[in-house]
C-alpha cells in the first residue's frame, strides 16, 4: 500500500480520474470545436482518439503508478534506474505545477463570478467591465486565495480518502447541475439552431486535416495525459482493479461531460442571437450575457458557475496532488508540510500572473510546450524504457482476459508516434488542446 493510502473502490478511483479529466477544456473549448469542425462529423475522429488515448495512454500512466507504488518523481526513477532517473520526472512535475498555477487564476475568476451572481454585481454592471476589472493584476486576490485554501484543505488529510470523498460529491453534482441546465436550455425559443450547429453533420469536414488535428488535440488534453497527474492516482490503486476497463470508463464519462456542456451552452447562445466563441470569452462574457437576458438568469448563472467550480476544483486537486506526493517522498517531509509548501508557492506565483494577458501567455507556454513534451516523455518512458513485458504484467492484474498484441501495437507505435505529432502540431498551430 502507498503511504498515502489506496482508493477504497473502483468507483471512487474512476470518479477521481474523471474529476481530473473534466475541466475548462470540456466546457469552453469542446462545444465550439464540435460545431466549428463539422458538427456530428467531428465526433468521428474525436471518439476514435478518445478511445485510443483512453485505452493505451491513461492505462499506461495508471499502470506505471501502481507498479512503482509512487507518483511522478519516484515512478520515472523506477523506470530509468540510473543516476539521471531521479531528475527526469521533474519536467512532468513542472508541467503539473505550472498548469495548477494558471488554473488557480482561472478558478479565481469562477469564484469571483459566483460572488458577482450572489451580489447581483455581475448583471447590474457592464459584463465586459466586470470581466476586465476581475482580470487586472492583483484584482482578484481574495477569491484566488479561497480557491487554493479550499483545495489545500481537501488535500491536508489522508490523500486518497480526501480525494475520493471530494470527487464522490463534486462530480455527481457537476453532472446533475449540467443536466438541469441542458433541460432548461432545451425549452428556449431558438435552441434548435444551437442543436443544428452542434449536431448537423458536415461530412466534408472529415476531408479537412484541421478537423482531425483539433479532434486529436481536444481528446488528448481532455483526458489529462500529462506524464504526471494520472501516475499518482495509479499509485493509489489496488492490484485487483482492471486498469484498461477503468481507463475506458474515465474516457466515457469525460466525453459525456463534454457533451453535456455542449448541450447546455450552445443552444442557449443561439437562442439569444449571440455568436458562438470559445475560450474564456465564452465562459465569462458570452454566457453571462445569455443569463442576463433569460428568465431566472441569476439562478441559472449560479448553477453554471458552481458546476464549473466543481469541475475545476477536482482538476486542481489532481495537479497539486502530483506535486505534493512527489515532494513528500523526495524531501522526506510530512504530507501537511508538502501541501502547505505547494499551496504557498502556487499562490505567490499565480498572484503575480493574475492579469488576463499574462496568465494567457503562461498557459500557452505550459500547454503548448511543457505538458506535450512531458506527456511524450511519459509515453517513451513507459513503452520503451520500462518496456512492454513489465507493463503487460501490470495491466493484466485484475483482468479476466490478458491484454493482447493489439494493445502493444497501439501503445508502443501508434500512441507514442501521435504524442510526437501532438507536440509538433501544437507548436505549429500555437496550441491544439
Sequence positions of predicted segments:
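Helix-loop-helix connectors at the membrane interface of multi-pass transporters/channels
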Residues: 74, 107-135, 236-240, 245, ...
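Transmembrane helix-boundary motif of multi-pass solute transporters/channels
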Residues: 9-49, 228-234, 241-248, 252-255, ...
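Loop-to-transmembrane helix boundary motifs in multi-pass membrane proteins
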Residues: 6, 12-14, 20, 138-142, ...
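Inter-helical loop and helix-membrane interface segments of multi-pass membrane transporters/permeases
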Residues: 2-5, 32-37, 67-91, 104-162, ...
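Transmembrane helix-loop boundary segments of multi-pass membrane transporters
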Residues: 29-46, 80, 161-170, 245, ...
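Membrane-interface "cap" regions at the ends of multi-pass membrane proteins
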Residues: 1-29, 57-62, 66-79, 83-87, ...
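C-terminal membrane-solvent junction of multi-pass transporters and transport-like membrane proteins
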Residues: 88-93, 323, 330-343, 365-427
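Membrane-embedded translocation segments of transport machinery
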Residues: 2-7, 11, 164, 168-313, ...
Amino acid at each position: 500500500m502507498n503511504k498515502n493510502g489506496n482508493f477504497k473502490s473502483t468507483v471512487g478511483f474512476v470518479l477521481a480520474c474523471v474529476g481530473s479529466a473534466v475541466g475548462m477544456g470540456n466546457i469552453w473549448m469542446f462545444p465550439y470545436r464540435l460545431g466549428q469542425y463539422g458538427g456530428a462529423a467531428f465526433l468521428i475522429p474525436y471518439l476514435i482518439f478518445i478511445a485510443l488515448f483512453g485505452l493505451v495512454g491513461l492505462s499506461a500512466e495508471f499502470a506505471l503508478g501502481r507498479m512503482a507504488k509512487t507518483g511522478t518523481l519516484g515512478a520515472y526513477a523506477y523506470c530509468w534506474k540510473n543516476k539521471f532517473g531521479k531528475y527526469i520526472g521533474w519536467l512532468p512535475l513542472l508541467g503539473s505545477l505550472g498548469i495548477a498555477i494558471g488554473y488557480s487564476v482561472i478558478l479565481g475568476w469562477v469564484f469571483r463570478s459566483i460572488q458577482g451572481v450572489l451580489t447581483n454585481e455581475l448583471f447590474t454592471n457592464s459584463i465586459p467591465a466586470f470581466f476586465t476589472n476581475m482580470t487586472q493584476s492583483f484584482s482578484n486576490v481574495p477569491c484566488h486565495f479561497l480557491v487554493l485554501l479550499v483545495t489545500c484543505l481537501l488535500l491536508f488529510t489522508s490523500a486518497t480518502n480526501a480525494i475520493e470523498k471530494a470527487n464522490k460529491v463534486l462530480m455527481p453534482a457537476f453532472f446533475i447541475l449540467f443536466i438541469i441546465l441542458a433541460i432548461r436550455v432545451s425549452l428556449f425559443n431558438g435552441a434548435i439552431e444551437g442543436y443544428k450547429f452542434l449536431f448537423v453533420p458536415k461530412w466534408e469536414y472529415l476531408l479537412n486535416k484541421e478537423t482531425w488535428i483539433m479532434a486529436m488535440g481536444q481528446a488528448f488534453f481532455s483526458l489529462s495525459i500529462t506524464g504526471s497527474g494520472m501516475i499518482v492516482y495509479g499509485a493509489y490503486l489496488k492490484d485487483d482493479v482492471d486498469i484498461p476497463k477503468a481507463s475506458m470508463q474515465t474516457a466515457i464519462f469525460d466525453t459525456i461531460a463534454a457533451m453535456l456542456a455542449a448541450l447546455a451552452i450552445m443552444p442557449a447562445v443561439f437562442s439569444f442571437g449571440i455568436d458562438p466563441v470559445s475560450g474564456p470569452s465564452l465562459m465569462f462574457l458570452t454566457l453571462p450575457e445569455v443569463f442576463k437576458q433569460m428568465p431566472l438568469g441569476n439562478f441559472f448563472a449560479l448553477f453554471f458557475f458552481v458546476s464549473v467550480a466543481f469541475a475545476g476544483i477536482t482538476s486542481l486537486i489532481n495537479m497539486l496532488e502530483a506535486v505534493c506526493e512527489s515532494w513528500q517522498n523526495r524531501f522526506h517531509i510530512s504530507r501537511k508540510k508538502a501541501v502547505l509548501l505547494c499551496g504557498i508557492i502556487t499562490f505567490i506565483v499565480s498572484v503575480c500572473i493574475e492579469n488576463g494577458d499574462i496568465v494567457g501567455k503562461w498557459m500557452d507556454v505550459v500547454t503548448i510546450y511543457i505538458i506535450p513534451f512531458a506527456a511524450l516523455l511519459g509515453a517513451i518512458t513507459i513503452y520503451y524504457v520500462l518496456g512492454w513485458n513489465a507493463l503487460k504484467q501490470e495491466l493484466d492484474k485484475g483482468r479476466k482476459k490478458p491484454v493482447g498484441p493489439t494493445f502493444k501495437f497501439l501503445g508502443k507505435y501508434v500512441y507514442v508516434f501521435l504524442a510526437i505529432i501532438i507536440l509538433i502540431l501544437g507548436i505549429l498551430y500555437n496550441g491544439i488542446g
